[in-house]
Amino acid sequence: MQKLAVYVYIYLCMLISVHPLALDDGSQPTENSEKDGLCNACTWRQNTKSSRIEAIKIQILSKLRLEQAPNISRDLIKQPLPKAPPLQELIDLYDVQRDDSSNGSLEDDDYHATTETIITMPTESDFLVQMEGKPKCCFFKFSSKIQYNKVVKAQLWIYLRQVQKPTTVFVQILRLIKPMKDGTRYTGIRSLKLDMNPGTGIWQSIDVKTVLQNWLKQPESNLGIEIKAFDENGRDLAVTFPGPGEDGLNPFLEVRVTDTPKRSRRDFGLDCDEHSTESRCCRYPLTVDFEAFGWDWIIAPKRYKANYCSGECEFVFLQKYPHTHLVHQANPRGSAGPCCTPTKMSPINMLYFNGKEQIIYGKIPAMVVDRCGCS
């Protein structure tokens, strides 16, 4: 697929470059010409920066295959996220971006986001309600991003309430099936025995990869599961419907899928800051703040360093770009000239709510400008 980022930058470069040519032909050089040139450069960079931010908003929605920003209910956003280890690790040790120059060239980057981890919260199973006459946990709906042959890990996380004394807990995960002739409605998925000590409750993970893959291959077989965790006295310790003081302790599925990194080539370019007087093509810093957009459906990062390219590309320096140089030599009036664009970009990792109110952890390619050049 063609790289949208390249076309956006080339278009912006051509559009913005018109500004310096719109001067009055009768204007005369003055002693302030150098100062005016610096002001023009600042205005140019400001226009480029604003256009870059708008382009980023469009690219994120496009790369996540979203027609518009998800309309997530305020109640869901205010609801505490699961307090389990895998999600806390993603948030606490969040790798917003990598400045590793060995990864992520523009040419080798795929366009759409690659999903790495999906956190799926449970819903009530209509089939269970119909059978039992009351809501039961749990039923999981799955994103179309998950393909059965790409699943490398699937863990069901459940929270077990605290115990008052050393206790053996018997955990059983049952899969709901269509009633059989003998009345059987469940089949076992996993059973395990745990020794719990007094104190706070604990999170327990259970491997459900095989079950998930079967559900993905045969969606009609996904009717829900039931979670049981009884102590020696028959007390149910599993939090399935959180009570008072149990916010964020819902069971959930953590699914990890494959993501194959790609090799890239090295390139070099200029780095500048906003006070730089450099006129040549250069990379400038730019921080994108999602909260300023009102994009509260993005959990993390709330902001990231995107950077942008700005500056002049003189033909005298184009020995590195023979094709562009030949075009200009053949038709100097009809050639728009080279444009200062990204020559290397890297991805960002993002934790966000999708349109189905699932929490997705994925990698969005080509969102950070690492190097700029003329092309």
Swiss-Prot record:
Annotated SMART domains: TGFB
Proregion positions: 24-266
Keywords: Cleavage on pair of basic residues, Cytokine, Disulfide bond, Glycoprotein, Growth factor, Secreted, Signal
GO MF assignments: cytokine activity; growth factor activity
Signal sequence, start to end: 1-23
One annotated GO biological process: muscle cell proliferation
CDD domains in the cross-refs: TGF_beta_GDF8 (cd19388)
Keyword Translocase on entry: no
Residues of this chain annotated as glycosylated in UniProt: 71
One Gene Ontology CC term in the entry: extracellular space
Disulphide linkage map: 272-282, 281-340, 309-372, 313-374
Location in or out of the cell: Secreted
Protein purpose: Acts specifically as a negative regulator of skeletal muscle growth.
Subunit structure: Homodimer; disulfide-linked.
Family: Belongs to the TGF-beta family.
Record-given protein name: Growth/differentiation factor 8
